[in-house]
Amino acid sequence: MICHARLTAGGIETACITQIREFSRRGYKIYVLAENGFYAEKLKQIKGVTYIDFPYESRASYNLQKVEQVKEIIEKYNIKLVYIHQIDCVASVLSACILTNTPYIAYVHHGITGVYDDELQMGNMGRNFQTLYYKMASKIIAIQEASKKENMERFKLEENKYKIIPNCVDFLEFNSKSPINLNKVLLISRFEKDKKNGVINGLRWFLEYKKLNSKAELTIVGDGSQRQKVEEQIKELKIECHMLGARNDIRDIMEQNGIILGIARCAQEAIAMKRIAIITGNEDFQGIITDDNIEKFSYTNFQDIKNGKKEYAEVAKQVYLLKNKDIGKIVDKNYEWLYTNRNIKDNIYEVEDIEKINNPINELDRNEILRILIGELQYMHTWMQKEIDRGWGARQKTEDYYLGREKWNNKVLKEKEQELEQYIAKYNNALNELENIKNSKFWEIYKKLFKNNKNKI
C-alpha cells in the first residue's frame, strides 16, 4: 500500500506515481491511500491499482477515527507492506501499522535539511512519536546522502537501516524526438515558501534572456499559497507570460518548450525530454546543467550546489549563443548520464519476499508504547493549551474590536470581522478535536491500558 497525502501538483506526487507505474509493470497489486486531487484520474488508469480516496487527519490534530479507518483498510485488503511517503500520513498510518503488526517503509523526500522541528509544529506529533516512526520502519529510504546523515544523527539509528534511492524518471513516459526551440521558455515550480527564491530567480533570468532574444516567450506552470506574490513579481518586472496554473500534463507542455527552468524533479524530466535544463535554485541561481556539473547537481537532488551561484546575464548570453551542435552535445550527454543513473527501472525499493522482511514492530515493547502515548498526551495538552491561549487572544481582539470600531471605516471593519471569525473558528475546532478524542473508543481502551500498566511503567 502506497500512502501519500494528496494527489496534487508537486515533485513528491510525481515520484509516487513513477514508483507506482514501475510496481505495476512488475505485476504487483497496489493500493493507494491518498486524498483526491487532479492526479487521481491518471492514477486510476494504471493497471493493478486500487485507489482509495482518503483525507488524512488535519495537521493540527491526532484523529483516532482515522487510525481505525486505516487499520480496517489494511485488514480488509490483506496489506503486507506499506510505503509511507509524507509526514501528513504518519500519525494514522504508523498507528494502524502497529495495531496490525504490518511492516512499513519510511521515505525521506527532503531535498533540504532542517525540516524535522518544523514537522513538530504541525500539532499532531510529538518528538517521541516522530522518533518511533523512524525507529519502527523496516527500511528508511532517503533521496540523498545529506538527508540520510541528518536523519541518522537526529534519531540515533544504525546506518544499515537506510538506503539511498534518488527520485528517478520514467523514461517510458518522458521522451521526445521533437526539435528544441530556444524561443520557448518554461518555468515550473510550486508557489510555496519552501521554494524560496526559485521563481524570482527564473523570472530575473528570463528578463535578461529577453533582452538578447526578442522572440523569447515565457510559460509558467505552478500554483500555491504564494501565487499573488508571484503575480506581483511578474508585474513589477514587466514580464509578459502565459500562466497555466497547476497541471498534470507536464510532459506534453515540456514538448512545446526548449528551455526548462526549475529544480529537482522537473530538471530531471527536462533532461529526459532532451531539453536545455536550467536550475533556478532555492537560494542562488545555478545555471545550465551540462556534463561538467550534472553529477555535482545530482548530490543535491538537482538543487543548489556549493559555490554554484551564476549571474543571470552571463547564463542568458551563454544560452543565446548556443549553436545547434552545442545544444545537441549538451542534451545528449545529460540524457546519457540521467538514463544510466536515474532510471526508475533500476532505482526502486522492491521487497520480493515480504514474509522475510525485518519488522521492528515485532520487538516493540507494550510498555514503551504506553510511555510514548503518555508523552503524546502531554505534548497534545501543551499544544492545545497554546490554542486556548490563542483563544484568549481572540477574546482580547474582540474587546479591542468593539472598543475601536467607532474609529474604523467599512474596509477596516470588514477585515477585522474576518480576522475575528478565523480566530473563533480555529478555537472551536481545537475544542471539537479534544471532545472527539475524549468520546472515542480508543480513549476508553487507552484508559484501561494505562490503569492496568501504570505500576509497570
PLM features: residue spans?
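N-terminal strand-loop element at the rim of the active site
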Residues: 4-10, 22-61, 222-227
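Nucleotide-sugar donor phosphate/pyrophosphate-binding loop at the beta->alpha transition
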Residues: 64-66, 103-105, 110-136, 171
